[in-house]
């Protein structure tokens, strides 16, 4: 059955985007991002609050990865999005997820997830990165 949402700027269903970075001390960090999408033919854009540790990590290192959750890891990825890395520094391990260094950028990738975009920060503005 079709549903009319009126004029909106969002798409459904939205994938769960897991953004991973390295913290200052080199430990992996991850957060779920609800707002992101295609910016150009070879760029994506994320809308992240400046309050997130992940945002600071991206600005400091200039790199991050974006993975998309799959059905097999939905519960683990949901946990990553619900728990703050400031309160639970090992939240990836507690979720049963493991990371390895990305091939082309200074950021981790989550081994269990089938897709990872390796990204470099091109620009930052108050509308998103």
Predicted regions and their residues:
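Active-site-proximal mixed secondary-structure blocks
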Residues: 1-31, 37-129
């Amino acid at each position: 059955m079709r549903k009319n949402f009126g004029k909106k700027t969002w798409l459904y269903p939205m994938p769960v985007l897991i953004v991973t970075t390295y913290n200052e001390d080199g430990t992996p960090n991850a957060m779920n991002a609800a707002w992101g999408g295609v910016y150009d033919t070879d760029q994506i854009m994320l809308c992240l609050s400046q309050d997130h540790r992940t945002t600071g990590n991206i600005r400091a290192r200039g790199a991050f990865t974006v993975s998309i959750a799959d059905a097999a890891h939905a519960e683990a990825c949901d946990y990553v999005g619900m728990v703050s890395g400031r309160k639970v520094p090992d939240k990836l391990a507690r979720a049963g997820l493991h990371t390895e260094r990305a091939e082309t950028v200074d950021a981790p990738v989550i081994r269990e997830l089938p897709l990872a975009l390796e990204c470099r920060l091109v620009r930052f503005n108050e509308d998103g990165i």
